[in-house]
Amino acid sequence: MKRVCIVGASGFTGGELLRILLQHSGVEVVCATSRKFKGEYVYRVHPNLRGFTQLKFVEPTIDAALKADVVFLALPHGESVKWVPQLYESGVAVFDLSADFRLKDPNAYVEWYKWPQPHPYPDLLAKAVYGQPELHREELVGARLVAVPGCMATASILMLAPLAKFGLISAPPVVDAKIGSSGAGAEGSVVDLHSFRTYVVRPYEPVHHRHIAEIEQELSRLAGKEVKVAFTPHAVDIVRGIFTTGHVFVEKMPTEADLWKYYRALFGDSKFIRIVKDRLGISRYPNVKYVLGSNLVDLGFELDARMKRVVTFAAIDNLVRGAAGQAVQAFNIAMGFPEDEGLRHIPVAPI
């Protein structure tokens, strides 16, 4: 039984970590921190947890976290880096859901996250495992510092990974992403208020979005060469979910059989990835509607011979597979639990 502390447990991601870990047979949640809600019952902030826990929020301190064997950091970017060195040095396993240990180049944090200087702990950065289980499974076994990938990066990387791995990417892919309002977090801003967000389809950070750094890092690793990506996200009028479409212009068109072979080679054994390309039924390509509440990734593709283009698709729940669920999946592999422990959720439909 692993004793777990969730630091930053009052936000959407923290709430999802609680929801999942409270159902995990190998975990005891001993600590949930929140400066704002210190002393309050967890279920008063996360009403869906009423009747499942009597846990109260505590002040976020290193001492509180060190009562656990494993710490999940659900903190804003730039905050986790203040916690990780001492936790790691104390022997605690850390699963960081911020971006603070995702990028391998210390200098990348200056460009992509506007840090005033390169990453202050390059040694820990080198030790951190990028926590995308399907692509880093062997590295995750026994890992003590895991950087959980970003939500839109997760969908983008997984849908393009087979094309990168099997040499189809010669020109920069173009990625269009759409994300629900929960991606902005529990605090939000004025544009996340109901009157602004309802009916919206709005681009934001249309160039140089920070998730590009992760996408390029991982696709370059798979391709064995530098891969650059044109990426534009959009805020849309849903609460949960991410849908990404990738456009890959190729030198030589693959066949449909080739693409099935590539996707199955990379993801055929995955417990959570479904290849959705059907000739019948009401959902012939991936659809956010049919992954909500789950750790599933639905991937699909189509061929455009006229334009020598492969179109790829991915649908995930941003709070589960894009954050808490992927963190627990990585935790399970690292700690020797069944990979799907606590994550056997069939998506809710209709919704």
From Swiss-Prot:
Pathway in which this enzyme or protein is active: Amino-acid biosynthesis; L-lysine biosynthesis via AAA pathway; L-lysine from L-alpha-aminoadipate (Thermus route): step 3/5; Amino-acid biosynthesis; L-arginine biosynthesis
GO biological process: arginine biosynthetic process via ornithine; L-arginine biosynthetic process; lysine biosynthetic process via aminoadipic acid
Places the protein is found: Cytoplasm
Recorded catalytic activity of this chain's protein: [amino-group carrier protein]-C-terminal-N-(1-carboxy-5-oxopentan-1-yl)-L-glutamine + phosphate + NADP(+) = [amino-group carrier protein]-C-terminal-N-(1-carboxy-5-phosphooxy-5-oxopentan-1-yl)-L-glutamine + NADPH + H(+); [amino-group carrier protein]-C-terminal-gamma-(L-glutamyl-5-semialdehyde)-L-glutamate + phosphate + NADP(+) = [amino-group carrier protein]-C-terminal-gamma-(5-phospho-L-glutamyl)-L-glutamate + NADPH + H(+)
Tagged with keyword Amino-acid biosynthesis: yes
InterPro entries linked to this entry: AGPR_type-1, LysY, NAD(P)-bd_dom_sf, NAGSA_dehydrogenase, Semialdehyde_DH_NAD-bd
Top class in the EC scheme: oxidoreductase
GO CC list: cytoplasm
Pfam families: Semialdhyde_dh (PF01118), Semialdhyde_dhC_1 (PF22698)
Keyword Coiled coil: no
GO-annotated molecular function: N-acetyl-gamma-aminoadipyl-phosphate reductase activity; N-acetyl-gamma-glutamyl-phosphate reductase activity; NAD binding; NADP+ binding
Keywords: Amino-acid biosynthesis, Arginine biosynthesis, Cytoplasm, Lysine biosynthesis, NADP, Oxidoreductase
UniProt binding sites for NADP(+): 10-13, 34-36, 318
Enzyme nomenclature, EC number: 1.2.1.103, 1.2.1.106
Positions of the catalytic residues: 151
Matches recorded under SUPFAM superfamilies: Glyceraldehyde-3-phosphate dehydrogenase-like, C-terminal domain, NAD(P)-binding Rossmann-fold domains
Biological role stated in the UniProt entry: Involved in both the arginine and lysine biosynthetic pathways.
Family: Belongs to the NAGSA dehydrogenase family. Type 1 subfamily. LysY sub-subfamily.
Record-given protein name: Putative [LysW]-L-2-aminoadipate/[LysW]-L-glutamate phosphate reductase
Species: Pyrobaculum calidifontis (strain DSM 21063 / JCM 11548 / VA1)
